[in-house]
Curated annotation (Swiss-Prot):
This is Beta-galactoside alpha-2,6-sialyltransferase 1. Pathway: Protein modification; protein glycosylation. Residues 1-9 are cytoplasmic. It comes from Gallus gallus (Chicken). Its main location: Golgi.
Amino acid sequence: MVHINVLKKFMCVLVVILIALTVCLWKETRGSYYVPLKNDGTQVHRALDKWNLLKSQGLLHEAAGEMGQMPKALPNNQNKVKGITSGAVEKSRKAAEHVKVWDKDSSSRNLIPRLQKVRKNYLSMNKYNVTYNGKMNAAKLSPEQLLCRLRDRVNVTMIRGSDGPFNSSEWQHYLPDKSLNETVGRLGRCAVVSSAGSLKSSHLGPEIDSHDAVLRFNGAPVKGFQEDVGQKTTIRLVNSQLVTVEEQQFLKDALYNTGILIVWDPAPYHAEIHEWYRKPDYKFFEAYKSYRIRHPEQPFYILNPKMQWQLWDILQENSLEHIQPNPPSSGMLGIVIMMTLCDEVDVYEFLPSKRQTDICHYYQKFHDHACTMGAYHPLLFEKNLVKHLNQGTDEDIYTHGKVTLPGFRNVHC
């Protein structure tokens, strides 16, 4: 009987201890959840929930320093905007300290396992016979030095009637008479508009249309999306796959009838034009001719394939690891084309904003993480380079997905 009473007392004490521990744990959990939501940055914390998940993978970094200073790219006087109260300025300052943007030192370790495997497969496949023997980030270049490399080594030209197999009488009827520079003239501020899903609900349309010229990609529409992407199209860069695939309706869709067209096709690594001409990645030449017959007044250029590998070499030599041995993305090609034509280039949603999403295109519902991080193209390394060159602020990237780059004519080496 005595043993039973002792056992009962022991059980009661044990239950009390368990209850006390449960209460303590509940308070601790409750506190850790609610405390961040009590400060002035409530909206910032909520908006950044999914970005914090990416941060744990090392893809994103805090723009502000560990001590909470304003980042150098965002001086305090930028908050002194007419009509904003001092309280609003303080909230804006605190929000800026939590801005999280693309980390220019991102690496393949940041890729999800599936994309890491895809990258390794492309490295071993080496479809374009890449034999790069140059340096790999031996000494990290300053943005100014890198701009000089791009200006001096990437030759942005279009196929001309004097180029190898295109100098026949047959081709003279199809290639434009004027060069691209002659056609567009001197351009001031230009916009490069990606097709990213994060453009949805951005309300960037009026800002995009305020530029002197706008470049868009492939089949990205403006009709129905003007509020977010604008309606002006000066140049449309399309890949050769789109031109040759029947379901894209390239020859029939009125979408392509506006502005200047440029088509590009992947070529073997540093191949001569005649070698690429004999065996293009996609047999788009007949479709090109058909389009020119239907629309003889619309300028339609073929990008010289040498450019893609000149640009790829610079991407590789400024990366610490081997990048995919495939041509740069249309996005990266378009950025460099506009840097050649314009005094200043604003690039929208090439680096993801606070609206970052795995939806690939603003006009479709297809989801894939590769659209942000890259699979076939060395997109991750392209974004590292663009972030390094950015002359705008991290706040511009976070809020608008906007990167500002100088035109090459304003680069002084």
